[in-house]
A protein has these predicted regions:
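Alpha-helical segment proximal to the catalytic Tyr-Lys
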Residues: 132, 151, 177-178, 243
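Short, small/polar-rich loop/turn modules that mediate ligand/substrate recognition or access, typified
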Residues: 180, 185, 190, 245-247
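A glycine/serine/threonine-rich, flexible loop-to-helix segment
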Residues: 181, 193-219
């Protein structure tokens, strides 16, 4: 069965590259009008140009810091101006904020805060922003990209990252319970290791050949996932095929 988002309005955060880019193009190519936001202006513009080459002309790029409530509110107001509501929210913005793993006694409060701000606060503010429009329309889809780190031990070794990703999963469960009576589903996808952005690429290189080999051996499918693998899972969960699925976290990790 084909998945269509004709007539739907979607917001994707962290849309400039990797998983966010794949999700943006996946939604747009299936008929959605997508408001793609990020703080990386050059990468965001490149993503839109790439979409134009494949007829994904319904992508509207916006520079938005998801930790800034005023900017999130303005984005939701603009995106919902036409139809009166936002149908789909996909929160991809997050990551390790340029950090690397270190002993807990060396972690600063600011480092801890930076990761929680973009991962957990950002997802909270975006969900908070779209909830009224979804309630008014009687339906909606909220999807948060978490991580396998939120379900187990982070390969990054970054305490705040593992904690923030676990926090996202807790937020998903709570919002699913709260928003379900309004016809709104809330789910998350927990990717395995994906070489989808500069941070994950640095991590891959730092593993060295032996570390890379061990990682691959622990994946039953014996390959790394691609951004499109994550996007495909998202397409299903935000579609009409998943109207009875909420509060769930889908691991997309090759069986690891």
């Amino acid at each position: 069965m084909d998945i269509s988002f004709d007539g739907k309005t979607a917001i994707v955060t962290g849309a400039a590259h990797g998983i966010g880019e794949a999700i943006t193009h996946g939604l747009a190519s299936r008929g959605a009008t997508v408001w793609a936001c990020d703080i990386l202006e050059d990468a965001l513009n490149r993503m839109v140009v790439a979409g134009s080459a494949t007829d994904d002309t319904s992508i509207h790029p916006r520079i938005v810091d998801v930790t800034n409530k005023a900017q999130v509110t303005a984005l939701v107001e603009e995106a919902s101006a036409g139809s009166g509501h936002v149908d789909i929210l996909v929160c991809v913005a997050g990551g390790v904020s340029g950090q690397a793993g270190q002993a807990i006694e060396n972690v600063t409060e600011q480092q801890w805060k930076d990761i929680f701000e973009v991962n957990l606060k950002g997802a909270f503010l975006c969900a908070q922003g779209v909830a009224p429009t979804m309630k008014a329309s009687g339906e909606g889809r909220i999807l948060i990209i978490s991580s396998g780190a939120g379900l187990g031990v982070s390969l990054t070794g970054i305490q705040a990252y593992a904690s923030a990703k676990a926090g996202q999963i807790g937020l998903v469960r709570q919002l699913a319970h709260e928003l379900g009576p309004y016809g709104i589903t809330v789910n998350s996808v927990a990717p395995g290791f994906i070489r989808s952005n500069p941070s994950s690429e640095k991590q891959w290189i730092a593993m060295g050949e032996e570390g890379q080999r061990r990682l691959m051996e622990n994946i039953p499918l014996r390959r790394l996932g691609a951004s499109e693998d994550i996007a495909n899972a998202v397409m299903f969960l935000v579609s009409d095929l998943a109207t009875y699925i909420t509060g769930q976290t889908l691991s997309v990790n090759g069986g690891r």
